[in-house]
Amino acid sequence: MSEGPIRVAPHPIAKRVKHGCKTPHVSHIDDYRSQHRETIGHESDKWWAKKAHELLYWDRPFHTVRSGSFENGDIAWFPEGGLNASYNCVDRWAFKHPEKTAIIYEADEPGEGREISYAELLREVCSIANVLKSFGVKKGDTVSVYLPMTWQAVAAFLACARIGAIHSVVFAGFSAEALRDRMQDCKSRVLITSDEGRRGGKAIATKAIADAALKECPAVEKVLVLKRTGNPVPWTEGRDVWWHEAVARVPRYCPPEVMASEDPLFILYTSGSTGKPKGVVHTTGGYLLCAALTVKYVFDVHPDDRFACMADVGWITGHTYIVYGPLAIGATTTVFESTPVYPTPSRYWETVEKYKLTQFYSAPTAIRLLRRLGHEHVNKHDLSSLRVLGSVGEPINPEAWHWYNEHVGKTECAIVDTFWQTETGSIVVTPFPGAIETKPGAATVPFFGIEPAILEPTTGKVLEGNDVEGVLTIAHPWPSIARTIYGDHQRYLETYMKPYPGYFYTGDGAARDEDGYIWIKGRVDDVINVSGHRLSTAEIESALITHTGVAETAVIGTADELTGQAVYAFVTLKPEFKFDAENEAGLSKELILQVRKIIGPFAAPKRIYIVSDLPKTRSGKIMRRILRKIVAGEADQLGDLSTFADPGIVEVIKEKVASAA
């Protein structure tokens, strides 16, 4: 973590939100403060009960708003209540305005997408629910979903929820081994997949990968296969069933199963420090409420808005902000099958212009990539429909923030740099469009019901006031907090509740600046201690990326005999940057001086490696853990690399580090 207080001037509230045709849901900072106090005060249950009734339909009323504690790991919200997530996300709106667009499906190839109405979505959801019932799936069973980014993936989620089955969605870029492990762990009886997927003009062999995984999953009795491309695929008679053929044989309506608020809605696997994925369990009532609340308030979504989250449904961002959040409030959501650069770097902006999207939610990795490719791809499109721009996945560096603001938002859109995790279920720290001025790189303020506590890492003491930095925790339960790790509640308690008793441990460092804004400083294990100076890797990376030639960076700490730890940086360069490989030492010196100038001599990297790419997962997350192991001489302990976008880059980096030793 950095030394000294954070000093950044705020940007004014965005013109298109403050002076637009729609009044913001939270229109002044005093309104935010008043509501936030209400949601964490002694009578906060009244606020939560009111919102639960406003935003959700309950088949069975609740009398208790919340019970349980972090210490006991027995948190529950609206426990007597009964509802169905599918009914809340589809039926309500299909009955009210059947022809309204529920899903904008932008297919991989431009021109092949279409819009799906709430009425059509209801028919498809009910049909798939009946197919699952014909397979013998019942309430409490687990169904694995391994689908590409088609609109039918959304229908699969909601079909499971409709009959009380628990869905376990696996990102369609994961390997057969990763899929196998997840299906075995959650004891799936049915898998939903496709013949193939399409992304960036390339085919993804989903069915072939699924078949390889199924060789070691004898408990899976049925495989429902969506025909996406129509290409020949391996087939097991008696087990495999075509989606379109199954749908034709079942009734077009399926009554929703009333679920207890605390019944599991889904299991989603996330990486664990031990290497074994954790099956994070989210329940129905509390999760759905926070999904709806955050879409409405964080993105200022109104009934006729067209919301676009560019994530994959295989991640929590897709679960909450493609599927459950937008549909729970009756908005139009977007399923984007392609990549930001296929067939050209204008693809995102063509999509915004074509559908007149009003909110756009993407990741810093994509924003940095598009910035690197030039703003001319943005400037030729009409993006005037946009009001709110979102960022998710990691803190957005100021350079990317400014580019996003100036070239995509034309300095008139609100930018919400959101912080949350798979385990939190929904956004927990964020700006509020229309109410709060923003600072580039700041996560800003807690969402309703969230009471962050910044603790001194060693003692666990709460650091009060502003200009403090420590470990980020949350002081009280909120509705969408994960309830357990599937099959291992003890691991859940030890990971999140035991490190700082009485608080939920996020695993991230944070600072609160002079204005009370919260800044996420990266994972606690991404903090480097150099001669007693605690440095944030994110801050060093931001300093490096201000160099005109730098595209992306990844900074790690490694053991050093003299200073305890030393800073090592891996850097990729922009394609247009003229670089003589013979002068790598000269460029490295420039970059070191850049960090010394921006942060201070204590933050200067000891070694900089210029590389062609960084090790990333298919979702774009940079795997700094891999870089740490390579530098530490533990390259034989890297584990499974099958989830990487380009596993070959690891070998290239290993050779680079070895040759520089």
Curated annotation (Swiss-Prot):
PROSITE patterns: AMP_BINDING. Its EC number is 6.2.1.1. One of its GO terms (biological process) is acetyl-CoA biosynthetic process from acetate. InterPro entries: Ac_CoA_lig, ACAS_N, AMP-bd_C, AMP-bd_C_sf, AMP-binding_CS, AMP-dep_synth/lig_dom, ANL_N_sf. It comes from the Eukaryota. CoA binds at residues 199-202, 317, 531, 596. The keyword Lyase does not apply. ATP binds at residues 393-395, 417-422, 508, 523, 534. It is an enzyme of class 6 (ligase). Keywords: ATP-binding, Ligase, Nucleotide-binding. Pfam families: ACAS_N (PF16177), AMP-binding (PF00501), AMP-binding_C (PF13193). One of its GO terms (molecular function) is AMP binding. It catalyses: acetate + ATP + CoA = acetyl-CoA + AMP + diphosphate. GO terms for cellular component: cytosol. Belongs to the ATP-dependent AMP-binding enzyme family. This is Acetyl-coenzyme A synthetase. It comes from Coprinopsis cinerea. The lineage of its organism: Eukaryota, Fungi, Dikarya, Basidiomycota, Agaricomycotina.
